[in-house]
């Protein structure tokens, strides 16, 4: 065994530093898309006949699940460093493209502008497939705490964008020019932050001692995905031969084995995101009725969901509050389906207070169950198996999102559209 690997596996320092970087990388994974979702009132103003909240979401999810399916199939041989850097770079370039499009068209609507926004939404979906699966797979080979921090960062991006959107809306007022200025500021900040994430992942994260420690362990256990990241941290590793690879592979669980063993976790995540995305964001933007909050109403509901989602992802940090039974997690995810008639009835007969309450339940349960399921995946697997399982679970999350977005259109049945 390489002596440099032996050295690094005895020096796991910098855990808190790594947790902070994981959180920031989690924010970057969804910041660009959450920025697009959060300014949905601006797109509804520009493109009132195109159902932008629904169209953009289904385009995003279609490209995300399509690309992720290919990446999951090839995950064992992919260069994780190249995969994640490509994703964060595409997020940054996509955010910059929204900014340029907004400035070039001077905030005018029309089919040309809408097609441009749709193309950028597709690019965000492609970037998400690279980063989300890549990061979850990578962190699955480390520790549940890193996963929890990354997942909390995902939710924090939504909470941050929602809070900023409310401030911008109040500052720029509800005029076309004000909405446009707010959108411009949003994506300027998004493009900058995504560039920071590129730098963090490229030059900071691989040099943290505890990260090198876990990646060195992964190499010892036969992982081929982290060589470039370990090299970026200053540890050079000789590639294993094909004969060694075949010998190690014979003793591993393949993707089919993993899915049979952990199908309950995959189904739970699918159901969680099926329910969430059948309501969020399309139903919130178009089908919740009109109340005293006026055009602030959809933004407030989105903010409530995002903040509740963030809180839910920290609840499992209290060990007594973390649900560990896989059967209970599955039953709870099935129970959430009762929220569909609850939202429907409240949208017709209820007050805005009840709608806000239901939205907080939706967000809190979404965040809580996500962290409980992903961090409950076993850590006695070999590193390549953990990476494969992490990617598979993300695929089921994206599958649930896509199915939910498709079901979201059912809210329009019987309406004049």
From Swiss-Prot:
Membrane-spanning residues where?
Answer: 20-40, 52-72, 85-105, 109-129, 144-164, 185-205, 265-285, 292-312, 328-348, 354-374, 393-413
Localization: Cell membrane
| Tissue spec | Expressed in leaves and flowers.
User: What main location does UniProt list?
Assistant: membrane
Q: What's in the keyword line of the UniProt record?
A: Cell membrane, Membrane, Transmembrane, Transmembrane helix, Transport
Is-annotated flag, keyword Iron?
Answer: no
Q: Per the record, what is one GO cellular component?
A: plasma membrane
A molecular function GO annotation: nucleoside transmembrane transporter activity
Q: Which PANTHER family match?
A: EQUILIBRATIVE NUCLEOSIDE TRANSPORTER (PTHR10332), EQUILIBRATIVE NUCLEOTIDE TRANSPORTER 2 (PTHR10332:SF30)
Q: What does this protein do?
A: May be involved in nucleoside transport.
Name the family: Belongs to the SLC29A/ENT transporter (TC 2.A.57) family.
Q: What is this protein called?
A: Equilibrative nucleotide transporter 2
Give the organism's phylogenetic lineage. Eukaryota, Viridiplantae, Streptophyta, Embryophyta, Tracheophyta
């Amino acid at each position: 065994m390489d002596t440099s690997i032996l050295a690094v596996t005895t020096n796991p320092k910098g855990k808190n530093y790594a947790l902070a970087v994981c959180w920031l990388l989690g924010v970057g994974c969804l910041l660009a898309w959450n920025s697009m979702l959060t300014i949905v009132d601006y797109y509804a103003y520009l493109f009132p006949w195109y159902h932008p909240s629904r169209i953009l979401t289904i385009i995003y999810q279609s490209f995300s699940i399509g690309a992720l399916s290919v990446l999951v199939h090839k995950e064992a041989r992919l260069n994780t460093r190249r995969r994640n850097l490509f994703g964060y770079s595409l997020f940054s370039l996509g955010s910059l493209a929204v900014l340029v499009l907004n400035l070039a068209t001077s905030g005018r609507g029309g089919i040309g502008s809408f097609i441009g926004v749709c193309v950028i939404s597709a690019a965000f979906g492609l970037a998400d497939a690279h980063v989300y699966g890549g990061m979850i797979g990578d962190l699955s080979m480390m520790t549940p705490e890193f996963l929890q921090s990354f997942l909390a960062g995902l939710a924090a991006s939504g909470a941050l964008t929602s809070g900023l959107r409310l401030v911008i809306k109040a500052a720029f007022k509800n005029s076309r020019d004000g909405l446009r200025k707010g959108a411009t500021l949003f994506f300027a900040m998004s493009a900058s932050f995504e560039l920071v994430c590129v730098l963090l992942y490229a030059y900071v994260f691989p040099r943290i001692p505890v990260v090198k420690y876990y990646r060195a362990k992964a190499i010892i256990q036969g992982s081929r995905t982290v060589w470039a990241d370990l090299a970026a941290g200053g540890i050079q590793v000789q590639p294993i031969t094909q004969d060694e690879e075949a010998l190690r592979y014979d003793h591993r669980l393949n993707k089919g084995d993993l899915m049979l063993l952990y199908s309950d976790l995959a189904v739970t995540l699918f159901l969680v995101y099926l329910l969430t995305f059948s309501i969020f964001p399309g139903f919130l933007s178009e089908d919740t009725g009109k109340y005293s909050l006026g055009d602030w109403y959809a933004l407030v509901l989105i903010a409530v969901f995002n903040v509740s989602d963030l809180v839910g992802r920290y609840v499992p940090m209290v060990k007594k509050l973390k649900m560990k039974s896989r059967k209970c997690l599955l039953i709870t995810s099935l129970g959430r389906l009762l929220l569909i008639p609850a939202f429907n009835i409240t949208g017709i007969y209820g007050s805005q207070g009840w709608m806000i309450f239901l939205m907080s339940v939706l967000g809190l349960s979404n965040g809580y169950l996500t962290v409980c399921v992903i961090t409950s995946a076993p850590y006695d697997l070999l590193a390549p198996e953990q990476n494969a399982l992490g990617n598979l679970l993300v695929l089921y999350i994206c599958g649930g999102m896509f199915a939910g977005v498709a079901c979201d259109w059912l809210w329009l049945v019987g309406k004049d559209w």
